[in-house]
């Protein structure tokens, strides 16, 4: 496997950083695009542990940062970036930039693989790109009213004070302070007023988008995760394409200690979808 750090231009001054993984001898199957979860990045979680397995199957892989990576970060100045500033629309744009970068290298439409918020955004991308050959959802969240109802119950972001903090964010935006940071008691702890309100109001529903998905899908969820928050079965029932659901035992949202099982499930499923049995047997 060969690995190269890459930079992908966007429509702002902030590019997307990532890693491009190629099999020894080059890709023989196609490409995969791996999308990280909220406040994560391309060198942790699935974007890190999946490429070695996928390149063995013949896939080239792009693991990349969205502009909303980590919680807060800075690169070559004191200007900061990260998930505290992210919007749903920006995340969707970033997938378009990343996929276009892959196809500019001569590849056909990539397999889309996304963890958590990366999976949520992946569903929206694939709904607009029916040429996508396959999609893997790793605990893709429900979108829709998730931030409004589920996250407060789980104590995330503003928790039970969501309505109160939403009004505060709306007032800040009305007063021209939309880019100022708000502090919250729950993960991910800080967000601008604009980003926080965006999170509460702009996310499409993953399940309601399912009828627009025509490619085969693998949807994985850990058994310690909420079915409402990560609605694999409901998505499968509504998808226009086939959708296989796998519930992993003794598994939480970040797959700690269960990475090998995730790798096995994803690899075996891709082998079946792309008729790669001869590669797996070697």
Language model features with spans:
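Conserved alpha/beta-hydrolase
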Residues: 51-77
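Short beta-strand/loop motif that positions the catalytic acidic residue
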Residues: 213, 219-221
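Conserved loop-alpha-helix segment in the C-terminal half of the alpha/beta-hydrolase fold
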Residues: 223-245, 250-251
């Amino acid at each position: 496997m060969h690995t190269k750090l890459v930079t992908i231009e966007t429509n702002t001054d902030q590019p997307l950083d990532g890693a491009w993984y190629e099999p020894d001898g080059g890709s023989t199957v196609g490409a995969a695009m791996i999308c990280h979860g909220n406040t994560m990045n391309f060198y942790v979680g699935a974007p890190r542990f999946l490429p070695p397995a996928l390149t063995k199957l013949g896939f080239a892989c792009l693991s990349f940062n969205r502009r909303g990576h980590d919680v807060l970060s800075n690169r070559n100045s004191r200007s900061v970036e990260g998930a505290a500033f992210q919007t749903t629309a920006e995340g969707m744009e970033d997938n378009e930039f990343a996929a276009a970068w892959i196809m500019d290298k001569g590849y056909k439409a990539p397999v889309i693989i996304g963890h958590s918020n990366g999976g949520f955004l992946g569903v929206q991308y694939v709904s607009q790109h029916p040429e996508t050959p396959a999609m893997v959802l790793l605990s893709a969240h429900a979108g829709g009213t998730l931030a409004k109802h589920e996250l407060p119950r789980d104590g995330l972001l503003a928790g039970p004070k969501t309505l109160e903090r939403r009004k505060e964010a709306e007032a800040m935006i009305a007063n021209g302070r939309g880019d100022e940071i708000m502090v919250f008691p729950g993960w991910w702890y800080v967000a601008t007023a604009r980003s926080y309100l965006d999170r509460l109001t702009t996310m499409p529903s993953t399940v309601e988008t399912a009828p627009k998905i025509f490619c085969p899908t693998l949807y994985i969820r850990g058994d310690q995760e909420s079915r409402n928050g990560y609605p694999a079965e409901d998505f499968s029932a509504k998808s226009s394409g086939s959708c296989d659901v796998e519930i992993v035992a003794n598994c939480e949202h970040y797959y700690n200690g269960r990475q090998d099982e995730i790798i096995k499930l994803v690899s075996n499923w891709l082998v079946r979808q792309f008729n790669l049995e001869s590669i797996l047997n070697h």
